Amino acid sequence: MLRQSFTMGMAKRHMAVKPQLVIGNKNYSSWSLRAWFLLREADIDFDENRISLDTAGTAAQIAEFTQAGRVPVLLLDEVTVWDTLAIAETAAERWPDKNLWPGDADARAHARSISAEMHSGFGALRAGMPMNCRAMGRKVSLPDELTQDVDRVIAIWSDCHRRYGSNEGWLFGDFCVTDAMYAPVVLRFRTYGVNLPESAGFYPRRLLQSAAIQDWLAAAESEIEVIDREERGQ
């Protein structure tokens, strides 16, 4: 049945005239935000296909597009790309004029390193502060592992500001993949009221000014689905 659903999804994709990004709930899906924000902020035109997560039909709906079982998924011509970092690398190759990685080789290596760190690490942050755009003002407990993750994020942002800081406010001066990778962390800190030193505050301020982020937050606010396991704090 999953194979049949996947084949049907492939047929749907081949009829598309532009890239299609399959995402989850905007209130909760941090990985969806990363891919969506990257494409939107870079002014890459795409169709959005939103699937409500954690429902009886979620797995079958996702299986129409990928057998990986997760969102986001980017559908490009004859190619299916899943996993946010793979989508980012593919976008950087497909649209080289968008300069989605820093031009300087050393800065690019740094950007890739901290993007990969976000991709593979920060487990305590994900578990203790799940992305929940509607839960403004909630407080969560801060065990040592979570505090260490928060401190590491602050150190990363502060280091980028010191090394690449500009009036644009992005982590490497101009917008790049890394800004999309850390976008959900900004929204987590916003929800749970994490105080930041000035050295780490430039990037969150810039990100929250983005029209794309404002659109995402407005859409998240209008969603009615509740995923109980993502509801943390008081």
Question: What kind of feature is each model-predicted range?
Answer:
Residues 4-142:
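GST-like domain detector, emphasizing the conserved glutathione-binding G-site
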Residues 21-23, 49, 173, 190-191, ...:
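Short, contiguous strand/loop micro-motifs
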Residues 31, 82, 101, 154-158, ...:
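Tryptophan-centric aromatic hotspots in well-structured domains and transmembrane helices
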Residues 74, 133-139, 170, 222-229:
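Short alpha-helical linear motifs
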Residues 98-103, 126-128, 169-171, 198, ...:
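Short, hydrophobic secondary-structure boundary micro-motifs
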Residues 122-209:
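GST-like fold's C-terminal all-alpha helical module
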Residues 199-234:
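Long hydrophobic alpha-helical segments typical of transmembrane helices together
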